Curated annotation (Swiss-Prot):
PSII is composed of 1 copy each of membrane proteins PsbA, PsbB, PsbC, PsbD, PsbE, PsbF, PsbH, PsbI, PsbJ, PsbK, PsbL, PsbM, PsbT, PsbX, PsbY, PsbZ, Psb30/Ycf12, at least 3 peripheral proteins of the oxygen-evolving complex and a large number of cofactors. It forms dimeric complexes. Residues 1-14 form a propeptide. It comes from the Eukaryota. The gene is psbC. This is Photosystem II CP43 reaction center protein. The modification Phosphothreonine is found at residue 15.
Length: 473
């Protein structure tokens, strides 16, 4: 039997609010949803829903382009990016555009091009969104069956899933191609303090790549966030892109197995909840990555990580006091532990003092001073280079402290410089967004499961507490 496409609603859902209010000719009586239910009015209008999604993409890309150009217009090449409140230019610089040795910006034109390309793209998407929302067919099933769908059609849904996976895989390979063939990417570990280089010797060993997933998430291990060389990052994208593309082909060619048909809820709201759950995980992982990882997010552009700034302070004062004659190998601190250097529980030589808790930091300016057993005393006495001193002094004074209202510095310091690290911004915003996406996942999953079980009726307004309360006036 052919499914009827014209059924506006086949969900046992009532959203009782204000039936008299009509919006754009779609009132609650005909759609079953009040104006504030957003795209729920479009659940079975595939053409209009396409318009909403394309327009949303246009808004996202417009923000990217406009913000990109705003950052270019305000950029001062003499100051580090992280001192200028930039969040987009550091991403472009990390991809190797416009920067040279040490992360110095040598050309801002690629950044301008990026902004203009995004603005032009957003105009195309905006036009498409308005067209499909206002002028195009309400439903695609009749005129364009390839793009049409019914939410309950499990085979079509997995085909759409497959197409999305292939697009994600292509996205992963774009980074691979940039790193291999199109000028390379910025490597903060390049000798002498970072440079743009092509990544030639990819890590493709599955034991290495998937070993990250099996690592502990705690200190010294750090799960996938502990990745600290670009060969592993780009090799991981080869694996990820391949898995996404092959998984996409698999989902296009196959129908869901019986266990999947039984286990999952097959409705528009269920798919929304799955997507929100996935985005929530992305948000939390991005939060950890930008906060702790200084390879994927080089400190030259994003500022130092918290542990990095702390270790930089210990290093800076070790250098100063050593010049003033202190024996940094044996000086005792106020607690009886080493003042500058001490041993970790497993025997490595680490920086002493409060920064001991950040013993597992790895940073390009510090690693040359390590030996087989942690920090090497003879290297600390003879091998410290001026660029390492400059880098650590700079990072010491740019710790990622500060709050979302842009009040920078240590909370107890009355004269703090008003500096907020992009790491603070990006980590906090992605954590908060990840959290709200998770709440949305729970909300829509609960509604979708209830609707599938047949007992979702919206809120019962007959016995609402407010009805028995005294009117405000």
């Amino acid at each position: 039997m052919k499914t009827l496409y014209s059924l506006r609603r086949f969900y046992p859902v009532e959203t009782l609010f204000n039936g008299t209010l009509a919006l754009a000719g779609r009132d609650q009586e005909t759609t079953g949803f009040a104006w504030w239910a957003g795209n729920a009015r479009l659940i079975n209008l595939s053409g209009k829903l396409l318009g909403a999604h394309v327009a949303h993409a246009g808004l996202i890309v417009f923000w990217a382009g406009a913000m990109n150009l705003f950052e270019v217009a305000h950029f001062v090449p003499e100051k580090p990016m992280y001192e200028q409140g930039l969040i987009l230019l550091p991403h472009l610089a990390t991809l190797g555009w416009g920067v040279g040795p040490g992360g110095e910006v040598i050309d801002t034109f690629p950044y301008f091009v990026s902004g203009v390309l995004h603005l032009i793209s957003s105009a195309v998407l905006g036009f498409g969104g308005i067209y499909h929302a206002l002028l195009g067919p309400e439903t695609l099933e009749e005129s364009f069956p390839f793009f049409g769908y019914v939410w309950k059609d499990r085979n079509k849904m997995t085909t759409i899933l497959g197409i999305h996976l292939i697009l994600l895989g292509i996205g992963a390979f774009l980074l691979v191609f940039k790193a291999l063939y199109f000028g390379g990417v910025y490597d903060t570990w390049a000798p002498g303090g970072g440079d743009v280089r092509k990544i030639t010797n990819l890590t493709l060993s599955p034991s290495v790549i998937f070993g990250y997933l099996l690592k502990s998430p705690f200190g010294g291990e750090g799960w996938i966030v502990s990745v600290d060389d670009l060969e592993d990052i780009i090799g991981g994208h080869v694996w990820l892109g391949s898995i996404c593309i092959f998984g996409g082909i698999w989902h296009i060619l196959t129908k869901p197995f019986a266990w999947a048909r039984r286990a999952l809820v097959w409705s528009g709201e269920a798919y929304l909840s799955y997507s929100l759950g996935a985005l929530s995980v992305f948000g939390f992982i991005a939060c950890c990555f930008v906060w702790f990882n200084n390879t994927a997010y080089p400190s030259e552009f994003y500022g130092p990580t918290g542990p990095e700034a702390s270790q930089a302070q210990a290093f800076t004062f070790l250098v100063r006091d050593q010049r003033l004659g202190a024996n940094v190998g044996s000086a005792q601190g106020p607690t009886g532990l080493g003042k500058y250097l001490m041993r970790s529980p497993t025997g490595e030589v680490i920086f002493g003092g409060e920064t001991m808790r950040f013993w597992d930091l790895r940073a390009p300016w510090l690693e040359p001073l390590r030996g087989p057993n942690g920090l090497d005393l003879s290297r600390l006495k003879k091998d410290i280079q001026p660029w390492q001193e400059r880098r650590s002094a700079e990072y010491m004074t740019h710790a990622p402290l500060g709050s979302l209202n842009s009040v920078g510095g240590v909370a107890t310091e009355i004269n703090a410089v008003n500096y907020v690290s992009p790491r603070s911004w990006l980590a906090t915003s992605h954590f908060v967004l990840g959290f709200f996406l998770f709440v949305g996942h729970l909300w829509h999953a609960g509604r979708a499961r209830a609707a599938a079980a047949g007992f979702e009726k919206g809120i019962d307004r007959d016995f609402e507490p407010v009805l028995s309360m005294t009117p405000l006036n």
